[in-house]
Design a protein with these regions (language model features):
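Short acidic-aromatic low-complexity motifs
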Residues: 3-37
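Short, cysteine-centered beta-strand-loop-beta hairpins and adjacent loop/turn segments enriched
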Residues: 68, 95-103
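Short beta-strand segments enriched in hydrophobic/aromatic residues
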Residues: 34, 93-95, 109, 125
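A short hydrophobic beta-strand element
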Residues: 83-93
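Hydrophobic/aromatic beta-strand elements that line small-molecule binding cavities or substrate pockets
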Residues: 75-80, 94, 106-111
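Short beta-strand edge/turn micro-motifs at domain boundaries
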Residues: 106-125
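A solvent-exposed, acidic/Ser-Thr-rich amphipathic alpha-helical stretch
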Residues: 27-79
Length: 125
């Protein structure tokens, strides 16, 4: 067992998430930090995006969002705040959605970590 990889703590996962988010490496975040059966929860008032389970569905949801974007002008994510097995951060983007004018979108994202992997993400906007 001495060759086994150490399980990342919630702080480790949050730090790595933030490191990758700063350079827009969202696919790498999903590939590296998410559990295969992770759940992604959108608010009830979300237009078009739904709550899904499993990485294939989460990737498809990301692709669906990308197809709604006409032009991405910029984005940000703040330093994560860790409490127990959860971390949260504020994220946002300056974006033009297809058929709409340029806008700023801001949200709070909360992530649950179990055994070194993200098992749930929930968005508030």
């Amino acid at each position: 067992m001495s060759t086994a990889e150490a399980v990342m703590t919630t702080q480790d996962v949050a730090n790595r998430f933030n490191e990758l988010a700063q350079t827009g490496q969202w696919e790498q975040i999903q590939n590296e930090l998410y559990e295969d059966n992770a759940v992604s929860i959108e608010p009830a008032h979300s237009q078009g995006l739904q709550t899904v389970e499993g990485m294939e569905a989460i990737r498809q949801k990301g692709k669906q969002f990308g197809e709604m974007v006409e032009e991405m002008h910029g984005g940000y994510s703040n330093e994560p705040i860790v409490a127990g097995n959860h971390f949260s951060l504020a994220m946002g983007m300056d974006v033009t959605m297809k058929g709409m004018s340029r806008m700023t979108m801001d949200e709070i994202a909360v992530y649950e970590v179990k055994d070194g992997k993200i098992v749930k993400e929930q968005f508030f906007y």
